[in-house]
Regions:
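Hydrophobic beta-strand signal
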Residues: 65-66, 79
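Short, hydrophobic/aromatic-rich segments at coil-to-beta transitions
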Residues: 41-43, 73-78, 99
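Structural motif
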Residues: 61-62, 76
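Short beta-strand-centered aromatic/proline hotspots
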Residues: 76-78, 88-93
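Short, positionally conserved secondary-structure boundary motifs
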Residues: 1-54, 85-86, 93, 97, ...
Length: 142
């Protein structure tokens, strides 16, 4: 599937409450690829599987955009390789501990121990969350 990269951006605040009829629209050009992928050589896309990050707005089947050039900070959402297995979690950096936190109460905090092999693969920058039930071109589900 080919997506048009240049599209029109209608600049206006969108009220979630009562709309203001006096608000005017401005039209600008927006290159979606430049917005979401400022560093193409270090940007990767992942299809999310599972529900451990729903509290962060990341749902099963979403498209996660990840930049490998960014430095992970405390509370960054990261792609991590933990003992060779890939996962998406929130990075928790404390004075003497490193942990990977899920954003769902059914998933425990993973405290990193010296016996664990942790590699921070990249930092999540955007999530594309479909608002319709139509199949997405990146979906892993049939």
């Amino acid at each position: 599937m080919t997506w048009p990269l240049d599209t029109r951006l209608l600049v206006r605040r969108i009220d979630a409450g009562f709309p203001s009829p006096a608000e005017e629209w401005r039209e600008l050009e927006l290159n979606v690829h430049e917005l979401l992928v400022p560093r193409p050589a270090s940007t990767f896309f992942f299809c999310v599987s599972g529900s451990s990050m729903v509290g962060a707005g990341i749902h099963d089947g979403d498209l996660l955009i990840v930049d490998r050039m960014l430095t992970a900070q405390h509370n960054s959402i990261i792609i991590a390789l933990l003992d060779g297995k890939a996962t998406v979690k929130r990075l928790q950096l404390r004075a003497r501990t490193i942990a990977l936190k899920a954003e769902h109460p059914d998933y425990p905090l993973i405290k990193i121990t010296p016996r664990m092999a942790l590699q921070i693969w990249g930092v999540a920058t955007y999530v594309v969350h479909p608002l319709t039930s139509a199949p997405q071109p990146w979906s892993l589900h049939p």
